[in-house]
Amino acid sequence: MANKIRVRYAPSPTGLLHIGNARTALFNYLYARHHGGDFVIRIEDTDRKRHVEDGERSQLENLRWLGMDWDESPETHENYRQSERLELYQRYIDQLLAEGKAYKSYVTEEELAAERERQELAGETPRYINEFIGMSETEKEAYIAEREASGIIPTVRLAVNESGIYKWTDMVKGDIEFEGSNIGGDWVIQKKDGYPTYNFAVVIDDHDMQISHVIRGDDHIANTPKQLMVYEALGWEAPQFGHMTLIINSETGKKLSKRDTNTLQFIEDYRKKGYMSEAVFNFIALLGWNPGGEEEIFSREQLINLFDENRLSKSPAAFDQKKMDWMSNDYLKNADFESVFALCKPFLEEAGRLTDKAEKLVELYKPQLKSADEIVPLTDLFFADFPELTEAEKEVMAAETVPTVLSAFKEKLVSLSDEEFTRDTIFPQIKAVQKETGIKGKNLFMPIRIAVSGEMHGPELPDTIYLLGKEKSVQHIDNMLAKL
């Protein structure tokens, strides 16, 4: 095994980058960068049935968007896709066959299904029963000849040491062990189509690429003893394994499901909605790991410096969309204006709102944004029809002092010349209404805000009125007075 730390992220190109897989990549990336090691990308494309066109490109594009870089990948190195490594796998399969550590299996899918059904009806744990048990060499040869004559293409199975104990000290979960008798019998290492199975190919790849640490989700724990069997059969040292806990929905407490449409689970979704990649990176880094303390906002460089595998959580990581949005808002509020405007610009352009007011509108709503696509509904006031009032807003406007406040403020606005109507002159007009009417606080400000914007909350009121313009602000107040 290599002395230098080398980790890998090895996705299957079967679709978009899920947040769980992004976390796997990110923790491997942080671990490698913290220790001065190598971060390797390898594509595991042996499952041809689930292969998705452009799946590999999507994975790499989204990792790059998150801000990860890598040292080796199919983009720069040959044979970093499993489909390009079939000769290498065949070499080791032939070796195991020659050494009697693996054998060709001619049992059919129908026979396997029938045996599985029998075992289940008998209350037995389903497992493969070696088809050659009880056969003499002559009977075995006749069986193989008959099967091959029938056109049956064999698989290759690894001969499992049923009395073996397969254990490791997990980087996250501590000591774990499996008995060879509980693996399910001799298992397939090469399918009928000539492709290796995952648990075989991954061992060959990790050894060949000198991977020192395998950090992945704990859904892979059951795969680890099988992989240890391959390491043992080939006489190789296994890497260190670390299995991260599941990501669960913070509201239901259940495993995060791709069918849950209330949460954004694919990195592509965050890109399309205009989240800052730095915010998504920060959020994912805290799913099952924390550096200690109360602080939650970290730059990429800080996360690299702080990353400590000993602080990987043993408890499930809660995915909280509200926390993601809070964190995203914090990043957008504190980002430079040019970066935020660049994110908002495509959404404004698509909505036909890239006017001379666009920059001022983004500046106005920047503190409220959780994602850049929100700039369109937030600016409806300036482009769309006046919104219907909510019940809470109607209740505010039902107060007997509202007509007095609105009429007085309208008069103040009308009295201002175009030159006098500026952002800085609006607040003094509101204070003048307070002085004249004796109405103050929410009873003063809230009716004006609702009458002008149709909302109880929003940017600073003088900013909204100034950008809306005197004429339109007066028009909105007149319309509201007519409804009272």
Curated annotation (Swiss-Prot):
What disulfide bonds does the UniProt entry report for this chain?
A: none
A GO BP entry = glutamyl-tRNA aminoacylation
Quote the EC number: 6.1.1.17
Q: State the superkingdom.
A: Bacteria
Q: What is its main location?
A: cytoplasm
Q: Which residues does ATP bind?
A: 258
Q: How does it assemble?
A: Monomer.
Q: HAMAP family given for it?
A: Glu_tRNA_synth_type1 (MF_00022)
Which protein are we looking at? Glutamate--tRNA ligase
Q: What is the lineage of its organism?
A: Bacteria, Bacillati, Bacillota, Bacilli, Lactobacillales
